[in-house]
Design a protein with these regions (language model features):
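Short alpha-helical segment of the dimerization/phosphotransfer core of two-component systems
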Residues: 1-5
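Short beta-strand/loop element within the Bergerat-fold HATPase_c
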Residues: 89-100
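Conserved glycine-rich
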Residues: 148-149
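Conserved micro-motifs of the catalytic ATP-binding
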Residues: 20-26, 63-66
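Conserved catalytic submotifs in the C-terminal HATPase_c
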Residues: 28-29, 48, 53-63, 158
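Short helix-loop "hinge" at the ATP-lid/N-box region of the Bergerat-fold HATPase_c
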Residues: 82-83
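Short conserved segment of the HATPase_c
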Residues: 110-122
């Protein structure tokens, strides 16, 4: 209870700060392969305990200008969701290409109705067993927008859910 409330307050404060930003301070050149590798390492043990394999595929060396902590939060939120909603024994693929990166899970995907609303603040698809506030993807979308990136949420052709962040 207290952990969930604390996480909700943290996410609300993060969104509030992001909403008030018009441009970014402390911008650095960020090698995205390093950023993704660090995020994968951070969640690796949690994923292993959940019985989920995380695979990192680097197909390009891309450097983007951005705020490191915010881009880290963006990737961490995506990985956290992918691990949370994937069944035990499945895999999460993180793939970096020249124009985008994707996070794809082997979960059930989501219904077309839910897909139309996912990423709205506080929206959670019906029938969720996992806890959450419905703010994580809103935070992802806002951070991406501040960095001139686009976020596409979709059911993957191979099954599961896929998030593509492109520039």
């Amino acid at each position: 209870g207290i952990d969930r409330a604390s996480r909700l307050v943290d996410q609300l404060l993060t969104l509030s700060r992001l909403d008030s930003l018009e441009n970014l301070d402390d911008v650095d050149a960020i090698p995205l392969a390093d950023l993704l590798q660090s995020a994968v390492m951070d969640i690796y043990h949690h994923a292993q305990r959940a019985g989920i394999e995380i695979r990192l595929n680097i197909h390009a060396q891309v450097t983007r200008s951005g705020q490191p902590l915010l881009l880290s939060l963006l990737v961490r939120n995506l990985l956290d969701n992918a691990v949370r909603y994937s069944p035990r024994g499945s895999a999460v693929d993180v793939t970096l290409n020249a124009q985008n990166f994707t996070v794809r899970d082997n979960g059930p995907g989501i219904s077309p109705d839910a897909l139309a609303r996912i990423g709205e603040r506080f929206y959670r698809p019906p029938g969720q067993d996992e806890t959450g506030s419905g703010l994580g993807l809103s935070i992802v979308k806002r951070i991406a927008a501040l960095h001139g990136m686009r976020v596409v949420l979709a059911n993957a052709r191979e099954g599961g859910f896929e998030v593509t962040v492109s520039w």
